[in-house]
Amino acid sequence: MHFKLIICFVEDGKTDAVMKAAREAGATGSTIINNARGEGLKQSKTFFGLSLETQRDVILFLVEEHLSRQILETIEQAGEFDQKPGTGIAIQIDVEDAVGVSHQIQTLQNIVEEEI
């Protein structure tokens, strides 16, 4: 079984919606890293030296490769990433190997068989 890692940078107010959508699309779990910061094309605004950045979360999804594109597109819709700038991004990268997921393999095999 081959995996992809979806890395999602999302406004903290949309974290729950993105996680729910990803699970409904086939993700079997996630890891959340809170309090992330970043910058896009425009520098962040400040008010008397204090940052006005919105809070961000990083969500990691280790997903089966056949489900990855569907999950990625579902995340984009739930997070409204393409509707307005600065709402978030999601990327996927190939995973060479993974350990600690043997308990999820049977569930993933059943999901993939239904999809194919």
Place the predicted regions along the sequence by residue.
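Positively charged, small/polar-rich N-terminal and surface patches that mediate targeting and assembly
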Residues: 1-116
